[in-house]
Swiss-Prot record:
Family: Belongs to the prokaryotic Ku family.
Sorted UniProt keywords: DNA damage, DNA recombination, DNA repair, DNA-binding
Top-rank lineage group of the source organism: Bacteria
Stretches with biased composition (Basic and acidic residues): 254-269
Protein name as it appears in the record: Non-homologous end joining protein Ku
Length: 290
């Protein structure tokens, strides 16, 4: 099992249970190293004192808060531990809200909340109660040197915890001003188009084609080959007649196997390796003698 990122107690009312938090997802991205263009050696980043130019070791560095230009208050890590709120070790559910009332825009990072030894029964009780009531819990927890407000919601794996963006962190966006009226007939065909594209959510069928192309590019370099360029999409034509465009879209969907569009889009963007073309030598003309 993966290492937990937090452990402590979850409480609601007089009920308390030991729990652990585990990361709910992790990004998988290809990373590149920075190299010296001339000899392809790795580039090192050093910590340098701005006053005397000395290269510093990690144990020579302290944390400081700049309260005035060029002047700092030095804070020791032990001092930060001393002022940790009780939520550093205890997560109390402060209230419950209906899941439908929470806009997903407030969800930040996801974690699995699992019971620790001795907390299995109250944990199972909470999971079942949340499922049957369609409520989510709101609690507070301190980790990574910050106190988070979090959502607790039932999940097939037990309870999912989502850290919450605070109100002042969520950007507001006004709804676009719609000047033209949507006709009932247009809405009807739009519903049919949605149904034609509707399917069961299967996250395993979605992939990052760009990352796959980068891997293919690296492989091509190692094997002395090249990759063909992905054809750029044509600029979509401006929709003049919305009803006509809807009807054409629906007709195209009827001729298409359900769920096949994703495979088509991925295939159109996936690169293939090709033999590297020999470099073209420049032809040099004879010099004319005056």
């Amino acid at each position: 099992m993966a290492a937990s990122v937090w452990s402590g107690y979850l409480t609601f009312g007089l009920i308390s249970m030991p729990v652990r938090l585990f990361s709910g997802a992790r990004g998988s991205r290809i990373s590149f190293n920075q190299l010296h263009r001339e000899d392809h050696a790795r580039v090192k980043q050093q910590l340098v004192c701005s006053a005397d130019g000395k290269v510093l070791e990690r144990d020579e560095i302290v944390k400081g808060y700049e309260y005035r230009k060029g002047e700092y208050v030095i804070i020791d890590p032990e001092e930060l531990k001393k002022i940790e709120p009780k939520t550093a070790k205890s997560m109390e559910i402060l209230e419950f809200v209906k899941a439908e009332e929470v806009d997903p825009v407030y969800f930040e990072t996801s974690y699995y909340l699992q019971p620790d030894e001795g907390g299995e029964k109250p944990y199972a009780l909470l999971v079942q109660a949340l499922k049957e009531s369609d409520y989510m819990g709101i609690a507070k927890v301190t980790m990574h040197n910050r106190e988070y407000t979090v959502f607790l919601r039932p999940h097939t794996s037990g309870i999912m915890l989502h850290t919450m963006y605070y109100e002042d962190e969520v950007r507001k966006m006004e709804a676009p001003k719609i000047t033209s009226e949507v006709k009932p007939a247009e809405v009807k065909i739009a519903h049919q188009l949605i149904e034609a594209l509707a399917g069961k959510f299967e996250p395993e069928k979605f992939h990052d084609v760009y990352e796959a192309n980068v891997k293919k590019l690296i492989e091509a370099h190692l094997e002395g080959q090249d990759v063909e360029a992905v054809a750029k999409p044509a600029k979509p034509a401006k929709v003049v007649d919305l009803m006509d465009a809807l009807k054409q879209s629906l007709a195209a969907m009827k001729d298409q196997k359900k769920g096949s569009r994703l495979a088509e889009v991925d295939k159109e963007s996936t690169v293939q390796m090709t033999p590297k073309k020999p470099a073209v030598k420049e032809r040099r003309g004879r010099k004319r003698v005056a």
